[in-house]
Amino acid sequence: MDIDASVENISKDTAEIIEVEELKELLKKDEKRAYVGFEPSGKVHLGHALTIKKMKTLQDAGFKITIFIANLHAYLNNKGTLDELNEVAKYNIKCFKALGLSEDTNFILGSDRMTPEYITEVFKAAKLTTIQRAQRSMALVSRNETHDVAQTLYPIMQALDIHDLDADIAVGGMEQRKIHMLAREILPRLGYRPPVCIHIPLIHGTDGSDKMSSSKGNFIAIDDTPKEIKNKINKSFCPIGVSEDNPVMEIAHYYIFDTHEKILIERPEKFGGNLELTEEELIQTYENEDLHPMDLKNTVSKYLIERLAPAREYMENN
């Protein structure tokens, strides 16, 4: 695959790339690395899976992939005790493997990187960062409106992780953008290269809120049973005639139409009979109110259950 084709492939379902020209230069290298960090969370859901899809795309483009399990960062962010977070981390790693990353994917626990050299670099980076900048960087990452001192270390540590892991690309959801911009600013001042940053859209929660989140319960987990998936989608926010910011339509976009050119909507003849639609046709049909939300939900449930079957099977057998 040539460079322009690789960039186009990487750019698919991406909110932004900072900067595209830098990405093109990276693609010319024989050795190139991309990383993403996750706080250990109770359940790995479709929001996480969208990011893992991007890591698989980068893997296919020749990047060595590191999945950084940020247990210490989560501890600083008041997400639990270290013992609790370490247990959740084991489960999360199993989930990420279930999503189809290659065998050579590197999984690293944040607490394993706490060398004296790393701590010294954190101190140096802290001297280049104001309290206000650190707090702004945490705004979309923390649940709290006010931050303690430990939380202000979080974005500084994350910026240093990029260098410490020798990553050329930092991947994350849009909530990570301010931290990544901090990294692009302070790493060169410490004598290190700035990362290319790839930001993934945030999937709406099943309740229609801005973000699918383990803590809010508005998610579909990658190891949910078929019954759980169907129940969650049936209860999902899905306003009639509205496709924008509709979580059910988003699931169709990211997890059905990425592998299907058309989908089959099965319904009784008295309700219009079966439909076979492209994504564009589905959007138009739904916005014209020629498709009932329940027919949409039933169809998306069927395809999503099928899509997640390999992950469920992996989780059951490993």
Swiss-Prot record:
ATP binds at residue 214. Its EC number is 6.1.1.1. It is found in: Cytoplasm. A motif ('HIGH' region) lies at residues 40-48. Disulfide bonds: none annotated. GO terms for molecular function: ATP binding; tyrosine-tRNA ligase activity. Gene3D superfamilies: HUPs, Tyrosyl-Transfer RNA Synthetase. A motif ('KMSKS' region) lies at residues 211-215. PANTHER family: TYROSINE--TRNA LIGASE, CYTOPLASMIC (PTHR46264:SF4), TYROSINE-TRNA LIGASE (PTHR46264). Homodimer. This is Tyrosine--tRNA ligase. It comes from Methanosphaera stadtmanae (strain ATCC 43021 / DSM 3091 / JCM 11832 / MCB-3).
